Swiss-Prot record:
Protein name: 1,4-dihydroxy-2-naphthoyl-CoA synthase
Chain residues that bind substrate: 45, 84-88, 97, 129-133, 155, 161, 258, 273
Ribosomal protein in keyword set: no
Keywords, in A-Z order: Lyase, Menaquinone biosynthesis
Binding site for hydrogencarbonate: 154-156
Annotated organism of origin: Haemophilus influenzae (strain ATCC 51907 / DSM 11121 / KW20 / Rd)
Gene Ontology biological-process annotations: menaquinone biosynthetic process
Annotated metabolic or biological route of this protein: Quinol/quinone metabolism; 1,4-dihydroxy-2-naphthoate biosynthesis; 1,4-dihydroxy-2-naphthoate from chorismate: step 6/7; Quinol/quinone metabolism; menaquinone biosynthesis
Cofactor or coenzyme needed: hydrogencarbonate
Gene (name only): menB
GO CC terms of this entry: cytosol
Amino acid sequence: MQNPKDDVLYAPVEWIDHSEGYSDIRYHKSTDGIAKITINRPEVRNAFRPQTVKEMMTAFSDARFDENIGVIVLTGEGEKAFCSGGDQKVRGDYGGYKDDSGVHHLNVLDFQRDIRSCPKPVVAMVAGYAIGGGHVLHMLCDLTIAAENAIFGQTGPKVGSFDGGWGASYMARLVGQKKAREIWFLCRQYNAQEALDMGLVNTVVPYADLEKETVRWCREMLRNSPIAIRCLKAALNADCDGQAGLQELAGNATMLFYMTEEGQEGRNAFNEKRAPDFSKFRRNP
């Protein structure tokens, strides 16, 4: 018998389209606090080019700073691919992927940082291929919900490429050093169950249930404390994000301190041109 609470979690979602002005992505927001960014290049298995990444970053920033949004979903158009990485047809000879003006970019690295530093949970909703740079994007998301037809793997050494940043180091954190080396050195592909078994994804569902299950997970998170989730994400990232991770964690502590009477006493004293009185605040051991 289904729990009555599940009825609310599985209720139909109402998406509002915010895709105007975008060519490579679709962007939607739900009426209950979920943003969804969809890579919309199914003709190339949702491979990204510089324009795609620019649009993802713009939509992502909008979702981050929208106080009505609590969770962000990243996905690909259709059932054949989440994202197959960088579009090799626009990969140039001078260190990146060429935009329409001929400038070479590796701006997907900026988008990776956006995912890691965003205080809101980011959920990868994966159907079909999550390969190469697309595989790294799903790994960097906080959670991954996979369809049964999902395929995971790296292709870098086959196409003269690699991700020596989070694509290597964070993968090793997820699956262990030996398995990470296997994935990168052999360039094999793994089905959804294999990905689940090695800790690359959180759950596997039939493709027909993929969005419904993803929305359920998002709604469960939306029921919880946003400050707690924000600080937990920063804490979970800090051990492998170096100084940037510590900065994010410390920034959250500063934000919380600003909300306290003690923090506000310092501000008020400065603005009122008087000495602050911190004597009333506890000095806990």
